[in-house]
Swiss-Prot record:
Disulphide bridges, residue numbers: C5-C19, C9-C21, C14-C26
Alphabetical list of InterPro entries matching this protein: Cyclotide (IPR005535), Cyclotide_moebius_CS (IPR012324), Cyclotide_sf (IPR036146)
Top-rank taxon, per record: Eukaryota
Keywords on record: Disulfide bond, Knottin, Plant defense
GO BP, sorted A to Z: defense response
Name of the protein described by the UniProt record: Cyclotide mech-7
Protein family: Belongs to the cyclotide family. Moebius subfamily.
Signal peptide residues on this chain, from the entry's feature table: none
Entry note about domains: The presence of a 'disulfide through disulfide knot' structurally defines this protein as a knottin.
PTM summary: This is a cyclic peptide.
Cross-link (Cyclopeptide (Gly-Asp)): G1-D29
Pfam families linked: Cyclotide
Record's keyword annotation contains Disulfide bond: yes
């Protein structure tokens, strides 16, 4: 859904629970 994680995932992983990597940023559904 809305990309409100405020995290980047240039190495391919996200630390924020519920967020997935949509390179180069983390997003929620």
């Amino acid at each position: 859904g809305i990309p409100i994680c405020g995290e980047t995932c240039t190495i391919g992983t996200c630390n924020t629970p519920g967020c997935t990597c949509s390179w180069p940023v983390c997003t929620r559904d």
